[in-house]
């Protein structure tokens, strides 16, 4: 959970092409480093999945919709996409066939709660389908959750790469140095998730993973949130970064994060 939130916070000052900084030598935190919709939805999904452990798919989806709408309305103006922002305020919200990277940025809880890979994939699908029911939207969430689950259960980077390429058809052959020059702000899963996974695969530790993701440019907060979620599962998160993460949340969001830590453990 910390990985996605830290990626969001650290990447937030560099979002959009005019803010992109295509190098790794940037201040990890600055005055403009703040949480966005990525964090809000990550925590909403976490609460929904915790509240419905052991329940059926319909109950899980209902809880997802409730928590996402409730928390999203409590934190307006945090960078939600136009379609998603409309969904937040619908009385009877329905999925809208999105393949945006929002499904992947918020999926951490599915991989962290899952007892096996099959469950991680299933929970990821449920978290995506309430809004992002396009096959690419579901695939992005599942690929991220699978990489996370494999990382936290001892798989090597080579095994993670092989699994993601084989099962999801993502091309992970290009290096970050090859991606970086022409990469720009895009919000689709198919143009964000492979790049985020590549940033993790090339990293040397947790912080380097986030710096590498941000250095690619593009939708930097979401890209780093996806990379960070996988990097946390593989490396863990240094305590000083956890403390800084909590410091940059509101008391309500910090309480949700701490509740997740306590119950998920």
Could you tell me what each predicted segment is?
Residues 1-265:
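Structured, active/binding-site neighborhoods that engage oxygen-rich ligands
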């Amino acid at each position: 959970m910390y990985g996605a939130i830290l990626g969001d916070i650290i990447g937030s000052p560099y979002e959009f092409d005019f803010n992109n900084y295509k190098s790794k030598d940037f201040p990890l935190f600055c005055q403009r480093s703040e949480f966005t919709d990525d964090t809000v939805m990550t925590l909403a999904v976490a609460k929904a999945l915790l509240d419905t452990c052991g329940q059926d798919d319909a109950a899980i989806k209902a809880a997802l919709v409730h928590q996402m709408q409730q928390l999203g309305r409590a934190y307006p103006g945090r960078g939600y996409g136009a379609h998603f922002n409309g969904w937040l305020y619908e009385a009877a919200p329905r999925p809208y066939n999105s393949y945006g990277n929002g499904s992947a940025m918020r999926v951490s809880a599915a991989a962290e709660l899952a007892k096996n890979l099959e469950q991680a994939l299933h929970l990821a699908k449920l978290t995506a389908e309430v809004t992002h029911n396009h096959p690419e939207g579901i695939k992005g969430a599942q690929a991220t959750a699978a990489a996370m689950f494999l990382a936290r259960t001892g798989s090597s980077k080579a095994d993670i790469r092989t699994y993601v390429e084989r099962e999801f058809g993502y091309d992970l052959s290009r290096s970050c140095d090859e991606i970086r020059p022409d990469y720009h702000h895009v919000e689709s899963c198919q143009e964000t998730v492979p790049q985020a996974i590549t940033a993790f695969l090339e990293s040397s530790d947790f912080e380097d993973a986030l710096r590498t993701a941000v250095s690619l440019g593009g939708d930097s907060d979401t890209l780093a949130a996806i990379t960070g979620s996988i990097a946390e599962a593989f490396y863990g998160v240094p305590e000083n970064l956890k403390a800084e993460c909590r410091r940059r949340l509101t008391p309500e969001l910090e309480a949700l994060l701490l509740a997740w830590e306590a119950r998920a453990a």
